[in-house]
C-alpha cells in the first residue's frame, strides 16, 4: 500500500534561503546600520514599488544621517556579494525529479525591482521555478497576509498542499496562519529532512529506511543506546514479509 505525499507545492524565499549575501561593504556603513535601514519602513515602501531607487537612497540618507552616494555604493556591494546556494537548489531539483514533475516550485520574495533584476542576472538555475512572486510586482510584502493570499490564488492551490520556506519566523508564522505548512530556514540539514517529509511518499520513505538499515534493525533508546532483542525484528518481519538480513538474538535457557 502507498500513500499520497502530503504536499506538492513548495514556495521559497530568495534572500538568505536560496541566495546568500554579505552586509560588509567598501563604505563607512557598518553591517549593523545596513541591516537597520534594510528593515526600515522606507525600504519596505521601496520593496513594494512605491518609491524610486533614487528617492529611497535619499530618504534613507536623511533618516540615518548617511550620504545617499554611500547608501548606493553599499547596496551595489551587497548586490555584488549575492550568490546562489547551488547545492540547495540542486536538492530542490532532485526533489522535483523524484516527484516525476508533479512537484511545483515557486519563489516569494520581499525585493525591489532593481534588486530582483540583479538577482536574475546571477548564474542560478531559475528554471526550477514555475513563477517568482516579488513584492515589487505585487505591491505587497511578507508578512502581510494579503501577499500570501495573492500567491495562493494565483497558483490556484489549497493552502494545506503548500510548504512555505523562509528564514524569518514571522513570515513562516503568517503562512501557517493561512493553513500552509511552514519551515523556518535555520539549519540546512534539518530543512532538507523536513522537505522530504512533506513531499515524499511515506511508505516509500519507510521501505527505503528498512533497506538502508538491513541487518541493523535494532531498537534504540532515547539516549542512543542499542537494545538487542527479537521483538522489533519479528514485528517488522510480520508487517513486511521481508527478513531484511535480520540476525535473531539467541536466548539460552
Residue ranges, per PLM feature:
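Active-site neighborhood of HAD-like aspartate-dependent phosphohydrolases
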Residues: 2-40, 44, 48, 54, ...
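Hydrophobic alpha-helical core bundles mediating ligand binding, dimerization, or RNAP-core interactions
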Residues: 56-61, 75-79, 115-119
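Asp-based, Mg2+/Mn2+-dependent phosphohydrolase catalytic module
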Residues: 1-12, 112-113, 117-205
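Alpha-helix C-cap/termination motif
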Residues: 63, 98-101, 154
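Short, acidic loop-to-helix structural element flanking the phosphoryl-transfer center
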Residues: 6-9, 70-106, 145, 188
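Generic structural signal for small/hydrophobic residues in well-ordered secondary structure
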Residues: 13-16, 49, 95, 107, ...
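Short, basic/glycine-rich phosphate-binding loops at helix/coil junctions
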Residues: 37-39, 59-74, 130-132
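Flexible, small-residue-rich N-terminal segments that precede or flank a structured functional core
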Residues: 203-252
Amino acid at each position: 500500500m502507498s500513500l499520497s505525499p502530503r504536499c506538492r507545492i513548495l514556495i521559497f524565499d530568495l534572500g538568505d534561503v536560496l541566495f546568500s549575501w554579505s552586509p560588509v561593504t567598501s563604505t563607512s556603513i557598518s553591517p549593523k546600520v545596513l541591516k537597520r535601514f534594510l528593515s526600515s519602513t522606507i525600504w519596505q515602501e521601496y520593496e513594494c514599488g512605491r518609491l524610486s531607487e533614487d528617492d529611497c537612497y535619499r530618504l534613507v540618507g536623511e533618516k540615518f544621517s548617511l550620504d545617499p552616494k554611500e547608501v548606493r555604493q553599499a547596496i551595489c556591494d551587497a548586490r555584488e556579494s549575492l550568490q546562489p546556494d547551488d547545492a540547495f537548489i540542486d536538492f530542490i531539483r532532485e526533489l522535483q525529479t523524484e516527484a516525476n514533475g508533479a512537484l511545483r516550485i515557486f519563489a516569494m520574495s520581499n525585493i525591489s525591482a532593481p534588486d530582483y533584476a540583479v538577482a536574475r542576472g546571477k548564474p542560478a538555475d531559475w528554471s526550477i521555478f514555475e513563477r517568482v512572486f516579488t513584492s515589487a510586482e505585487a505591491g505587497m510584502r511578507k508578512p502581510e497576509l494579503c501577499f500570501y493570499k495573492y500567491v495562493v490564488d494565483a497558483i490556484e492551490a489549497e493552502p494545506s498542499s503548500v510548504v512555505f520556506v523562509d528564514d524569518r519566523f514571522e513570515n513562516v508564522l503568517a503562512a501557517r496562519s493561512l493553513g500552509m505548512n511552514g519551515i523556518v530556514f535555520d539549519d540546512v540539514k534539518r530543512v532538507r529532512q523536513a522537505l522530504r517529509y512533506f513531499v515524499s511518499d511515506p511508505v516509500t520513505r519507510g521501505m527505503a529506511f528498512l533497506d538502508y538499515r538491513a541487518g541493523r534493525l535494532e531498537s534504540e533508546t532515547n539516549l542512543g543506546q542499542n537494545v538487542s532483542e527479537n521483538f522489533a525484528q519479528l514485528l517488522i518481519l510480520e508487517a513486511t514479509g521481508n527478513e531484511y538480513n535480520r540476525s535473531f538474538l539467541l536466548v539460552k535457557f
